[in-house]
UniProtKB/Swiss-Prot annotation:
PROSITE patterns: MSCL. This is Large-conductance mechanosensitive channel. It holds the Pfam family MscL. Keywords: Cell inner membrane, Cell membrane, Ion channel, Ion transport, Membrane, Transmembrane, Transmembrane helix, Transport. GO terms for cellular component: plasma membrane. It comes from the Bacteria. Belongs to the MscL family.
């Protein structure tokens, strides 16, 4: 049983999948850092919040009455919050990852795309008398019954 598992695990597809998962996790952390540390701070400055992740709505005050400066302070007080900023960060991260994967798949598909084969020779020709499509080997048109010269 161990031998079968080892053979399964060493097949190319499983190893490729494992490498893809590891690289995907690393890529996800890079995109998360890009969103949290590079993209969202300028947007946060534009809307008046320096830390965009701390944009939240207090649904129910905790033991200590609000307002709370951060999500962490609200959670420490036992408040129930709707963390809008963290959700927006996650959406932006998802969009960036999805767009990056789209571009990657597009490039890979372009690399592996087979070149268009030469168009196959036509199997029919037009009858010179009635313009109906007839097989190349036909010597008489089935539509108008005219005799047609053999195909070249």
């Amino acid at each position: 049983m161990f031998k079968e598992f080892r053979e399964f695990a060493m097949r190319g597809n499983v190893i490729d999948l494992a490498v893809g998962v590891v690289i995907g996790a690393a890529f996800g952390s890079i995109v998360k850092s890009l969103v949290d540390d590079i993209i969202m701070p300028p947007i946060g400055l534009l809307i008046g919040k320096v830390n965009f992740a701390d944009l939240f709505i207090t649904l129910k005050a905790g033991a200590t009455p609000g307002p709370y400066a951060t999500v962490a302070a609200a959670k420490a007080a036992g408040a129930v919050t709707m963390n809008v900023g963290q959700f927006i960060n996650s959406v932006v991260s998802f969009v960036l990852i999805a767009f990056s994967v789209f571009l990657l798949v597009k490039v890979v598909n372009r690399l592996y795309q087979k070149k268009d084969a030469a168009a196959p020779a036509p199997a029919t020709r037009d009858c010179p008398f009635c313009a109906t499509a007839i097989p190349l080997a036909a010597t008489r048109c089935p539509h108008c019954t005219s005799q047609v010269p053999p195909a070249d």
